[in-house]
């Protein structure tokens, strides 16, 4: 099957993806549905979801009965992401035809209005009518719930499908796994029906000859039969005991994947071959310099084709996630976004594109999807800059991660160097290779016995070729750095035959040649092929190597073979393992791909701890889940939802337009215009997650009142504090610490009781007015700052979070670089001019959301959930936002706004902190006091403010300190160099090699390396071990001159020396480093060096 498989259907001409989306919405509008715009990918006020992953998410509270809309039929095309948590399609994306991280879910919904009959009739009409989709009826299959686990079969749906015209042989029964839906362990649930389309050909690996021949039957899972629509019939309410109780108003929730429906309408097997993706794949091919047409002619599962699909998909997900306010981070949603971006970058690298490119894909996504999602026109530049920043960051961290991986693997390989790629569980290929090594070494030893060299005509080629083949066979099993060829020659020399004895007589010369050539091969392996090609010309002079091979076989007895194999096998007993935890840190921190690390470890013969990696990954996922599930807010435990249902509903005092009351639990906020309410009734008391009847003095609990002036924490503004008085208003019965809304409409007051309080008591609620006023100043100031930031920095600035309390305001916003001091000054000047204008802060209640956004041009705040009607805060012509918080009556009440700090929160997100009112005055008073102190330290310079004069003096002194520090380091280096150089005279000879072990304290590693190089030059040939103590830590460096690395390696020396100071280390044969924890043991470690070298040489 080729990459693009076309199937000719009768419904032509081909419908575009945009037309498929629009036609779905128009069909349901014609059936009395309201078109509702897609909600954000960041679920509002739903801690159970990482991302919006279904069309019904934005209607969840409507289905649960805690929210009322002014329509009971809706249709949407909902943006969805499944790349984390329960629904995680990330690893499959690009390698299958229908997995995506970002997708659109077409849906129609009924909130207690029509039910199964109309839902099934609508679905069938839309997909089969020539006026709409016009799919071939004989290609469609329906499924129903067959009945399972005590839940009856959905006979009604079965009959309804027959009634609309589906033959009974194409209506199939499925179990609870496929055809029963539930919102959770308890709550709304019900059977569902699916529509599947026969694509005519299999499209997955799960196929047999019947599938390949197109003879398989529904519901074969080979990919031939594609689910295009799921109709959920919410007709039950499952209680805690598992009993299914009929819902008084059954509802409908359907979902049809736009990408799948479009594939059917365009006659292609793969979603990636639809016009929803092909422009993106084409752009990805251009940016990665891949011949996309050539790849299309190949198998669709080719690596290049898969990588292009990954880039196309991930660019969609990244564009929409960032557009909706998600920023790359190391936890929660930001972490998933970072993984998506980095996976896209990695697949670009697999295609040979190592430069930033993914940010360019953002504009391709915008051009393709801006008609359906016009917000992309405004956000594209911001999104592209965020992706580019992440690409740059990833490139930097990748280099650091690769270096760290090399260090980790080198440290492991120092103990047992590069163990075999072939496992000892497969002895035959390993033993065969080892025997070949021994055979080649024996042949070389025989040739060297008469004094032959590499310069000997003809035979010189055979000699070098024989060593090369021995080395390559050794390398094939990963032992080229474990075993010396000279060791094998020595083992071969211990035999009884005359030929073996002849090898023994010339063993020293043989070992010297083998060591030198192996060292050359190790260090210059990249040039080998060139060198060997140059030697091909000498082949005609060579003697027949087969003759020597026959002689080897005559004398190569089983005992000797076994001896060599056993010797090598003994070196393989402790196979090193690369820690999965370490690998995950590189994956998580530096973005190193898992398969890259596995391959790198395997290439060096090191086992990879996959189980440890998986455990670390799962631990991180748990942390990520926790990071987005909640914070300081009260958990929405079942008690609050039960309370909302128990309390019933009550019309809000200000009814909505058209006479529709806002249905909400009996917990009404009346604090916009007053900070007191007399006669509030205690509706419920919650203590430790359970409902209680009363509180005693000192008890801490949450209390729900029917009417309250206390603002509940929302939109970044903290909850009010204050007091609850008895009905006389004279006695405080409880202190209110904060107020939160665990479920919509229920305002839970966290209180500490001073008197006995019982459910049903009448109390007077009084907000701390001073704290409220300070909070209001900061909240209105936040709106002014938001508008000023957009004016100074650009319209890409959007709120990314906020905190408003009485002491200060904190505002997080999208921006890519630090805000310059001059820009901060401009922002501060602009907002204070608005304060001085004393403009009225206009509050406009119950505005239809579309009017607020399109006519008032109100800005919606990040992460907030809005209903059909909203509250607009308008400050002159300067700022208009959707906001439910409390505000000053006019800007003049703010007094003064002072910006305290601006800094980075994460990539692409900045944070600004400021104070208003009395706190601004306090800040200026502190500044004035500081200026007085500065004037006593720094002599004021002409034209400089005290702050500027202080900065000038600090900069001057910092430069002076840097100069003195440099002079001190140079002095230390000079002193250490002099002392160490004089110590060369005390170098000892160990088995004919000069060895110097000395210390030079209070110098850094770079200086130590310089000393090592100087000492090696001075000694000419030898081993140097240098130790140093600085800041209570031991540093060790070993240097071996090049001429000695075949006999003794720096890494082996340092491994043993470091043990004496409680450390470890590794490195190259000529240079190795280590650290240690025991400074007192350094002298002993250096003294032990000579014995260690002697032992290693033995």
From Swiss-Prot:
Tell me, what is an example of a GO biological process annotation in this record?
Answer: alanyl-tRNA aminoacylation
SUPFAM superfamilies documented for this protein? Class II aaRS and biotin synthetases, Putative anticodon-binding domain of alanyl-tRNA synthetase (AlaRS), ThrRS/AlaRS common domain, Translation proteins
Substrates-to-products reaction catalysed: tRNA(Ala) + L-alanine + ATP = L-alanyl-tRNA(Ala) + AMP + diphosphate
Q: Where does Zn(2+) bind?
A: 779, 783, 883, 887
Q: Name one GO cellular component term.
A: cytosol
Recorded hits in Pfam families, A to Z, give: DHHA1 (PF02272), tRNA-synt_2c (PF01411), tRNA_SAD (PF07973)
What is written in the cofactor note of this entry? Binds 1 zinc ion per subunit.
Described purpose of this protein according to its UniProt entry? Catalyzes the attachment of alanine to tRNA(Ala) in a two-step reaction: alanine is first activated by ATP to form Ala-AMP and then transferred to the acceptor end of tRNA(Ala). Also edits incorrectly charged Ser-tRNA(Ala) and Gly-tRNA(Ala) via its editing domain.
* Matches recorded under PANTHER family: ALANINE--TRNA LIGASE, CYTOPLASMIC, ALANYL-TRNA SYNTHETASE
- Similarity comment text for this entry: Belongs to the class-II aminoacyl-tRNA synthetase family.
Q: What is this protein called?
A: Alanine--tRNA ligase
Instruction: Give the organism's phylogenetic lineage.
Output: Bacteria, Pseudomonadati, Acidobacteriota, Terriglobia, Terriglobales
Report the gene name: alaS
């Amino acid at each position: 099957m080729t990459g693009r498989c076309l199937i000719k259907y009768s419904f032509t001409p081909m419908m575009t993806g945009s037309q498929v989306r629009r036609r779905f919405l128009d069909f349901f509008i014609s059936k009395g549905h309201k078109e509702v715009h897609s909600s954000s990918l960041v679920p509002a006020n739903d801690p159970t979801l990482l991302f919006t992953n279904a069309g019904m998410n934005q209607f969840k509270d409507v289905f649960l009965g805690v929210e009322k809309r002014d329509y009971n039929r809706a249709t949407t095309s909902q943006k969805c992401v499944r790349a984390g948590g329960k629904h995680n399609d990330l690893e499959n994306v690009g390698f299958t035809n229908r997995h995506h991280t970002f997708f659109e879910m077409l849906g129609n919904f009924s909130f207690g209005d029509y039910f199964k009959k109309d839902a099934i009739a609508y679905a069938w009409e839309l997909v089969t009518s020539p006026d709409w989709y016009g799919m071939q009826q004989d290609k469609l299959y329906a499924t129903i719930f067959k009945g399972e686990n005590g839940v009856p079969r959905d006979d009604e749906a079965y009959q309804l499908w027959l009634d609309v015209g589906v033959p009974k042989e194409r209506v199939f029964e499925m179990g609870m796994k496929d055809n029963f839906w539930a919102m959770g362990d308890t709550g709304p649930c019900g059977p569902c029906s699916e529509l599947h389309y026969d694509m005519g050909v299999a499209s997955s690996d799960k196929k047999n000859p019947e599938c390949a021949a197109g003879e398989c039957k529904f519901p074969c899972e080979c990919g031939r039969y594609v689910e295009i629509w799921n109709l959920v019939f919410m007709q039950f309410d499952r209680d805690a005991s598992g009993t299914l109780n009929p819902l008084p108003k059954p509802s409908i929730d359907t979902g049809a994947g736009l990408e799948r429906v479009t594939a059917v309408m365009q006659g292609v097997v793969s979603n990636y071959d639809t016009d929803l993706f092909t422009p993106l794949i084409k752009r990805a091919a251009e940016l990665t310099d891949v011949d996309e047409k050539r790849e299309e002619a190949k198998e669709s599962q080719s690596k290049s084709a898969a990588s292009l699909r990954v880039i196309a998909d991930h660019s969609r997900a990244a564009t929409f996630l960032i557009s909706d306010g998600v920023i790359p981070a190391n936890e929660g949603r930001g972490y998933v976004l970072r993984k998506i971006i980095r996976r896209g970058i990695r697949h670009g690298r697999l295609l040979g594109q190592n430069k930033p490119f993914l940010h360019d894909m953002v504009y391709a996504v915008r051009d393709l999807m801006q008609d359906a999602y016009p917000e992309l026109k405004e956000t594209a530049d911001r999104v592209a800059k965020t992706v580019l920043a992440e690409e740059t960051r990833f490139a930097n961290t990748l280099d650091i991660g690769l270096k760290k991986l090399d260090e980790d693997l080198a440290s492991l390989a120092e103990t047992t160097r590069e163990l075999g790629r072939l496992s000892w569980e497969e002895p035959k290929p390993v033993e065969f290779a080892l025997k070949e090594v021994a055979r080649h070494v024996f042949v070389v030893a025989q040739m060297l016995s008469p004094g032959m060299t590499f310069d000997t005509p003809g035979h010189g080629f055979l000699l070098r070729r024989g060593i090369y083949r021995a080395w390559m066979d050794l390398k094939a099993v990963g032992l080229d750095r474990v075993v010396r060829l000279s060791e094998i020659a020595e083992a071969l020399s211990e035999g009884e035959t005359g030929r073996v004895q002849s090898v023994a007589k010339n063993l020293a010369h043989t070992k010297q040649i083998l060591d030198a050539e192996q060292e050359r091969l190790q260090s210059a392996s990249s040039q080998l092929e060139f060198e060997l090609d140059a030697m091909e010309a000498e082949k005609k002079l060579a003697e027949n190597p087969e003759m020597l091979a026959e002689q080897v076989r005559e004398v190569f007895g089983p005992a000797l073979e076994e001896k060599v194999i056993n010797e090598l096998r003994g070196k393989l007993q402790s196979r090193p393992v690369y820690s999965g935890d370490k690998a995950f840190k590189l994956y998580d921190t530096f973005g190193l791909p898992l398969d890259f690390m596995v391959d790198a470890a395997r290439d060096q013969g090191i086992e990879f701890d996959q189980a440890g990696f998986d455990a670390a990954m799962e631990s991180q996922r748990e942390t990520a889940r926790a990071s987005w599930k909640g914070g300081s807010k009260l958990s929405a435990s079942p008690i609050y939802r039960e309370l909302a249902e128990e309390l019933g509903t009550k019309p809000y005092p200000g009814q909505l337009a058209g006479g529709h009351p806002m249905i909400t639990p009996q917990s009404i906020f009346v604090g916009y215009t007053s900070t007191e309410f007399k006669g509030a009734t205690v509706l419920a008391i919650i203590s430790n997650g359970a409902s209680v009847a009363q509180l005693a003095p000192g008890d801490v609990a949450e209390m729900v009142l029917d009417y309250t002036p206390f603002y509940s924490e929302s939109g970044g503004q903290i909850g009010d504090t204050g007091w609850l008085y008895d009905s006389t208003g004279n006695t405080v019965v409880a202190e209110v610490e904060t107020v939160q809304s665990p479920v919509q409409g229920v305002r839970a007051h966290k209180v500490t009781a001073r008197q006995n309080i019982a459910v049903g008591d009448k109390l007077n609620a009084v907000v701390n007015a001073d704290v409220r006023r300070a909070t209001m100043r900061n909240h209105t100031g936040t709106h002014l700052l938001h508008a000023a930031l957009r004016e100074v920095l650009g319209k890409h600035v959007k709120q990314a979070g906020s905190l408003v309390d009485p002491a200060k305001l904190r505002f997080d916003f999208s921006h890519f670089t630090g805000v310059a001091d001059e820009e901060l000054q401009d922002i501060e000047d602009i907002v204070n001019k608005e304060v001085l204008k004393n403009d009225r802060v206009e509050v406009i209640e119950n505005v239809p959301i579309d009017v607020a956004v399109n006519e008032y041009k109100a800005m919606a705040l990040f992460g907030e959930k809005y209903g059909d009607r909203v509250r607009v805060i308008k400050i002159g012509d300067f700022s208009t936002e959707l906001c439910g918080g409390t505000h000053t009556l006019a800007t003049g009440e703010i007094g003064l706004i002072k910006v305290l700090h601006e800094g980075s929160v994460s990539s692409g997100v900045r944070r600004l902190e400021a104070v208003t009112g009395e706190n601004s005055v306090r800040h200026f008073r502190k500044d004035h006091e500081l200026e007085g102190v500065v004037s006593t330290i720094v002599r004021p310079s002409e034209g400089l403010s005290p702050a500027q004069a202080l900065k000038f003096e600090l900069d001057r002194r910092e430069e002076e300190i840097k100069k003195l520090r440099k002079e001190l380091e140079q002095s230390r280096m000079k002193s250490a160099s002099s002392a160490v150089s004089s110590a060369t005279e005390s170098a000892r000879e160990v088995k004919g090699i000069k060895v110097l072990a000395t210390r030079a304290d209070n110098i850094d590693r770079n200086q130590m390396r310089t000393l090592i190089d100087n000492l090696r030059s001075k000694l000419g040939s030898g081993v140097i071990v240098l130790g140093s103590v600085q800041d209570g830590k031991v540093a060790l460096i070993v240097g071996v001159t090049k001429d000695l690395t075949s006999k003794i390696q720096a890494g082996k020396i340092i491994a043993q020396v470091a043990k004496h100071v409680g450390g470890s280390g590794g490195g190259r044969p000529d240079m190795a480093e280590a650290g240690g924890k025991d400074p007192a043991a350094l002298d002993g470690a250096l003294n032990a060096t000579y014995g260690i070298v002697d032992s290693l040489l033995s």
